[in-house]
Design a protein with these regions (language model features):
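Detector for methionine-enriched segments
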Residues: 1-2, 16, 37
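N-terminal leader segment of winged-helix/HTH proteins
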Residues: 1-11
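Short, Lys/Arg-enriched N-terminal segment that forms or immediately precedes the first helix
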Residues: 10-24
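Winged helix-turn-helix DNA-binding recognition segment
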Residues: 20-30, 37-91
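Charged low-complexity intrinsically disordered patches
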Residues: 93-98
Length: 98
């Protein structure tokens, strides 16, 4: 007989699709980062610096994981010229891929 554990989810939790968690093409690091990104508020600072500030991963490590997520179409990073002429990056994050 198998035990079943239930967790009461009454506050501070995230609801997300299992799609990326079950995608065998993604590494555990990519699954973890995507899950973490999906748990953040929409107005959060989605940037390489922002992600590094809340992780023990190095800048190159985060960049590598983001590249993997881009290759599998879970993340798009758009490069746009900002108001002062500097480049800015917009992150589009997908729970499901088509």
């Amino acid at each position: 007989m198998m035990s079943v554990f239930k967790i009461e989810k009454n506050q501070n939790y995230t609801v997300m699709s299992n799609h990326h968690l079950r995608d065998r093409n993604l590494s555990y690091k990519a699954k973890g980062l995507l899950s973490f990104m999906l748990s953040l508020p929409d107005d959060w600072d989605y940037s390489l610096a922002g992600l590094c500030s809340i992780s023990k991963e190095s800048r190159d490590g985060i960049r590598s994981i983001l590249k993997e997520l881009q290759e599998h179409h879970y993340v798009e990073i758009e490069k746009v010229r900002g108001n002062k002429g500097y480049f800015e990056y917009n992150y589009l994050i997908y729970q499901l891929i088509l």
